[in-house]
Structure formats: structure tokens, C-alpha cells
A protein has these predicted regions:
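Multi-pass alpha-helical membrane architecture of UbiA-family
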Residues: 1-168
């Protein structure tokens, strides 16, 4: 397995929306980033290159049979990521996400756990939320945007309600 195939599996282009949502939530808290720069940095890394990336690996693993027909050039069906390594990378990246989230306290850990549960339930049989337009879209909207935004706001303000009015 080569590094370019691994990076392609994690789909960096998809990381921006949850990272942006976390940053917007942090801004909406009304708190100074200079006092909480480490929380913001860890949160942005957690939402994009870790949680979102793990969801991409998990989804590609469980879609490998369909991708073998529709998109055979992808890393798993093309064999650039051999055997069960696609699954192993999804598991490793999910566990790494939980480890990093533990540095954000209880709120950060449980928000990450919920996002990861949604990402696995979205793709993994027999649940496969993606097979239902309502449940699949709900899982994506919560784990990609909603949860990231709320977590960014909550981690900086230490509450679910901002201390200052915002234009949300």
C-alpha cells in the first residue's frame, strides 16, 4: 500500500465542510480564539482529517463491490489498497479520532463518538442508513455539519448557549 492511495481513500476534498462548521461554531461562541487556540486547532483537525476521513474510508470499504463496477479506479477496488486494509484503516482512523477527541474533554469525546457511530451506521450492513433518503441525509447532516458546529460552539463557551447574541 502506498501513501498516495491512502490519502486518496481519506478524500481530503471532503474535509473542508466539517472543519468550516467547527470553526463557525467556535466563532459563534463569542470567545477569543487566542485563549483557546489549542481547542480550535484540535477540533479542526479532528473534524476533517480524522472523523471525516475515517467516514470516507469506512464508506469506501462497504461500497467496494459497487465501486468495482462503477468506479474501479478507486483505491480499494483497484487493489492499490489491498485485502482488508480499507476496513483496517477505517477502524484505525476511528480509534485515532476517539483518542484525539479525549483531549477535548467529555463533550468533545461524546460528540466524536456520535459522529463516528453515524458514519459507520451510514455505510455498514445491515443498518446502511444511506439506503433510506431520510435517515441517510439526517446522518450526514448531523455528523458533517450540525454536530461539528454545535461542538465548536460548546467547546469554546463550555455551554450549549452562547454568552453573547449572535446572528444565527
Amino acid at each position: 500500500m502506498k501513501i498516495p492511495a491512502f490519502i486518496e481513500l481519506l478524500k481530503p476534498i471532503t474535509w473542508f465542510p466539517p472543519m468550516w462548521a467547527f470553526a463557525c461554531g467556535a466563532i459563534s461562541s463569542g470567545q477569543s480564539w487566542s485563549l483557546h487556540w489549542n481547542v480550535v486547532l484540535i477540533g479542526i483537525i479532528l473534524t476533517g482529517p480524522l472523523v471525516c476521513a475515517s467516514s470516507q474510508a469506512v464508506n469506501d470499504w462497504f461500497d467496494r463491490h459497487v465501486d468495482a463496477i462503477n468506479e474501479p479506479q478507486r483505491p480499494i477496488p483497484s487493489g492499490r489498497i489491498p485485502g482488508r486494509w480499507g476496513l483496517y484503516l477505517g477502524i484505525i482512523w476511528s480509534l485515532l479520532s476517539l483518542l484525539v477527541s479525549s483531549y477535548l474533554g467529555v463533550w468533545g469525546f461524546y460528540a466524536t463518538l456520535i459522529a463516528l457511530l453515524f458514519s459507520w451506521a451510514y455505510s455498514m450492513p445491515p443498518i446502511r442508513l444511506k439506503q433510506n433518503g431520510w435517515f441517510g441525509n439526517f446522518a450526514c447532516s448531523i455528523s458533517y455539519e450540525g454536530l461539528a458546529w454545535i461542538t465548536g460552539a460548546a467547546l469554546l463557551s463550555s455551554t450549549l448557549s452562547p454568552s453573547h447574541p449572535s446572528l444565527m
